[in-house]
Regions:
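Ser/Thr/Gly-rich low-complexity blocks that favor extended beta-strand/coil architectures
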Residues: 105-142
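Surface-exposed loop/turn motifs in large extracellular/passenger domains
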Residues: 1-8, 28-35, 53-64, 103-104, ...
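Catalytic cores of secreted or luminal carbohydrate-active enzymes
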Residues: 67-85
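Short alpha-helix capping/helix-loop boundary micro-motifs
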Residues: 93-107
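Short glycine/acidic-rich loop motifs that flank beta-strands on beta-rich extracellular proteins
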Residues: 18-24, 40-50, 59, 72-78, ...
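Small/polar beta-strand repeat architecture
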Residues: 128-177, 181-182, 189
């Protein structure tokens, strides 16, 4: 579902599907209530990809009273997209996807007039320190780049290959009373500002249960996260692959080789009143975070 607004999906169960269960892009205000992804009795797999995926959405995302089981990919992935600077001239930025995609860029996936670009600093190409309001956006004739004219003067330190994110692609997130079990990789991937994960249970995941990761290297998924609360959750038999150690909740970042990454990226991330069973000695690791 793309370019949509005020979406409610309630009381739906998906037994099996070759692909994702529910995919949303460039959409606003999405609620899932009683959304279940579970295989039929006697089968071990439900989906070959994510149960839910939210790309460059805004407004709010709410997932409550839902179950995710047997996927070959994540229960949910909430993220924006990094744009990589190609050229700079006065108040205009020419940018491409930070991760190459063999597809044409559509105007619907680009930032909109009135949005705010998050611009990095010289010491860390992924930490936003400067902001510029978008005046206009167009797509290049070859559909491989966007041309963004800003209302504000751009800082002198901006350079080619720096990562740019969009402030509005940080929806407020509430995930409550949900269950994740028997998943090949992870549970929840969350990249946003303002998220609460409450009263959820995670069991038998191959990788970490919750991942908060700005990723400029592999997928180009943004961005730096802040004001994240994980509370009253239960984690059991998490990260059997021992990825990054036996960690259940992991905040980190992936930089492109050779680019500067001094200091932190993420803001406040808190894990409170959670129970960890068979999750390793140190089940919570918060890297590149202002309050580890």
């Amino acid at each position: 579902m793309g370019d949509s607004k005020n979406i409610l999906i309630k009381g739906i169960r998906i037994y099996d599907c070759a692909g994702m269960g529910a995919h949303f892009s460039s959409s606003e205000n999405i609620a899932l209530d009683g959304f279940k992804v579970k295989p039929r009795k006697g089968l071990w797999m439900s989906l070959t990809a994510d149960a839910t995926h939210f790309n460059s959405c805004r407004g709010s995302i709410e997932i409550i009273n839902s179950e995710f089981e047997g996927m070959c990919d994540d229960a949910t992935n909430i993220h924006g997209m990094y744009w990589q600077i190609e050229n700079i001239k006065d108040k205009t930025l020419e940018m491409s996807y930070a991760k190459y995609r063999n597809q044409r860029i559509s105007i619907s996936s680009a930032p909109k007039a009135g949005d705010t670009l998050e611009l990095p600093c010289p010491e860390n190409y992924m930490r936003p320190t400067h902001f510029a309001k978008v005046e206009s956006v167009s797509v290049s004739p070859d559909k491989k780049r966007i041309i963004v004219k800003t209302c504000d003067e751009l800082p002198q330190w901006l350079a080619k290959d720096m990562a740019v994110s969009v402030k509005e692609y940080r929806p407020k997130v509430r995930i409550e009373n949900c269950r994740v079990g028997y998943v090949r990789p992870r549970g929840f991937l969350i990249q946003t500002t303002g998220a609460v994960v409450k009263n959820c249970s995670f069991k038998d995941t191959v990788a970490m249960a919750i991942l908060i990761e700005a990723d400029l290297n592999t997928w180009g998924e943004s961005a730096a996260s802040d004001d994240i609360l994980i509370t009253d959750c239960v984690f059991e038999n998490i990260n059997s692959s021992k990825r990054n150690g036996e960690v259940a909740v992991f905040a980190s970042a992936k930089f492109k080789k050779g680019l500067p990454f001094e200091g932190n990226i993420h803001g406040k991330i808190a894990v409170k009143n959670c129970l960890f069973k068979n999750c390793g000695k140190d089940p919570v690791r918060l890297e590149y975070t202002s309050n580890p």
